Amino acid sequence: LPISSFAAEEESSVESAAGYTNVDVPALGEPDGSLKDGGKQLTILCWNDDDLKYMYDIVADATGMDKSMINYKNVGSNGTEANEQYAQVFLSGDDVDLYFCDADWNMAYQNNDEYSAPLSAVGISEDMYANAYGYTVAMGKDKNGVLKGASWQAAAGGYAYRADLAEEYLGVTSPEDMQAQVGSWDDFWKTAATVYEKSGNTTAMADSLGGVWRAYSNGNRTKSWVNDGKLDPSSVGDFISMAKENFDKGYISGATQWNDDWLPQGMSDGAQANKTFGFFFPTWAIAKGGSLEQAEGGEGGSTYGKYALCEGPTSWFWGGTWICVYPKTDNAKEAGQFIYTMTADADAMQKYVDARGDFVNNKGVMSATTEAGTNSNPLFGGQDQFQILFNSADKIDMSIASEYDAKINTDLQNAVQDYCNGVTASEDDCLNAFLDAIAADVTDI
């Protein structure tokens, strides 16, 4: 269920990070003795090591920890699979110290004391996050207000578009001019019509139904899926109508997020060439080695560096990752060191920004990075993505989040996909299919 007092806590933390100077935070404390220590390996579960591989050296340099002690264990190929498989790993009795949780389902793990320990057990306290974006701290608490997870990133989203096609089809030569054409959903779809026509009815404005949903859901939805223990589907009607209309017109690609046909649309060669004009991507997708780099074909690919970034039709976010401590850890000291370094140590977080190009969960670091203007992202032809996303990060509001979001979002996207592909015949049928799926998948609401 939605975190109690979450909305009030989130509201109190809203402030502009522009010109923000970090306040001093306490040093990492000692473990409280409730968890085991002295183990040989610090085992970390995640669905990939895209972020982790940049953390090893940073943690080792900051703490003196031998980085060979850190053991990454892959669980699943994406966040959804990890959500389903973590519990099985826990039951197996395998070594686990830390694990990464996605925003869609971190509450389910943090609300289970058998799966997550208070961060205080490893020497971490809430006042260490005085410089963090407030929503990340609120999302790291369980239903009783106990801090169970910490995040190193703030995951604001934007619209990554083909700058070469924008100039060819729209005469647009800057992100500012592009934003003027996509600054609302009405403007976005109006521009989509022009792109589709100028491309000979081959190029969709949006990369997928899932991409549009992520931006709409986390930018325009104002109610939690679950209120007073009951499902509230009132937010979906407008989206279903918008999705169907623009899918039928060819303005939304038929590709599915994370499937093999999704990212190749971003290239100018191959079977999927030029199938989409742009992607709805958050910070982590446009960092080094992320989804955008794959969509460009990698360094030397057909569209490498040919993208640009604007805010798009709404301020939105997608995901974010929280680090949690497994209660059966045997490395309480190292677990605390790892989390503190990557989520509270400003110097270490600055190194991560420089190495990974991700947007970290520290207002002072991101304010200084943005004001310096030295960040240059080769995926965007040298554009500084932080200049676009900086203000959006302040607007992230997760007060409507619930622990059921992963299943509900998946069921909705499946229902809308079926409706757009003709499996279901009407909007009412689509909504009913969604509600039936929820009834089967989420039995306690």
Task: Describe the function of each predicted region.
Residues 120-127, 138-211, 223-257, 327-333, ...:
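Helix-loop-helix "hinge/cap" segment bordering the ligand-binding cleft or interdomain interface
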